[in-house]
Amino acid sequence: MCIRDSYKLPPVSLLKQGSSLSTSKKLLQETAKDLTQLLKEHGVEAELTNVVPGPTVTRYEIELAPGVKVSKVTSLSHDIAYALATPDVRLLAPIPGRSAIGIEIPNRQRKLVSLGDVLSSSEAAKLTHPLNVGLGLDIAGKPRLLNLSELPLSLIHI
């Protein structure tokens, strides 16, 4: 009898869960309003289409009006950071696969993501391979998991 066949993983309930902080809708709306006002003040015609709060940053997605250059928004990164009183702003221009620009602004209160959060998710429950690993949460708060045996040049063999 092989040890691998008789071994059972410990229950996920033993793992610590992270804090349940969530960004308030009021704060998200205020930041969205400040952001759209700033763009308007700099002559950028754009529409806020989506707000994606994550554990450490919130992505504000905007679509530019026809004729507005993406470079006009990307050149405003320091002005956006200054206006929102944040040390850094990241711009995704464009968001891959979409005709929108993502403006990622750090949350004032960051959520601690623990391994328990990732491995107790419904996505992790669907996986049965013994070499699945929880990596963390993506910007949208969705669990990111990886099967080590599927990695190229992996030295792990079962």
Model regions and ranges:
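Conserved small/polar residues in nucleotide/adenosyl-binding loops
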Residues: M1-S6, I156-I158
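N-terminal "pre-motor" subdomain/linker immediately upstream of P-loop NTPase catalytic cores
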Residues: R4-P152
